[in-house]
From Swiss-Prot:
Pfam families named in the record: Ribosomal_L30
Keyword field contains Metal-binding: no
Disulfide bonds: none
Keyword Ribonucleoprotein assigned: yes
Subunit structure, as described in the record: Part of the 50S ribosomal subunit.
Protein name, as recorded: Large ribosomal subunit protein uL30
Keyword entries, A-Z: Ribonucleoprotein, Ribosomal protein
Homology family: Belongs to the universal ribosomal protein uL30 family.
GO CC, any one term: cytosolic large ribosomal subunit
Any one of the GO BP annotations: translation
InterPro entries assigned to the protein according to its UniProt record, in alphabetical order: Ribo_uL30_ferredoxin-like_sf, Ribosomal_uL30_bac-type, Ribosomal_uL30_CS, Ribosomal_uL30_ferredoxin-like
Amino acid sequence: MENIIVTQVKSSIGVKKEHKLTLHALGLRRTGQQRKHKISPQLQGMLNSVRHLIKVEKA
């Protein structure tokens, strides 16, 4: 499995509640925070739903 680094680049203020919950599930609480994850189909769906708020890089 491949690892990725997810960074929150935009604030969650004013976004849909579902998107806020997705960011929290990814472990992102504030702008600029980073988390390392292993790629899975479930994670891909979560990243796709908040793609306008995050940046994804290969680890």
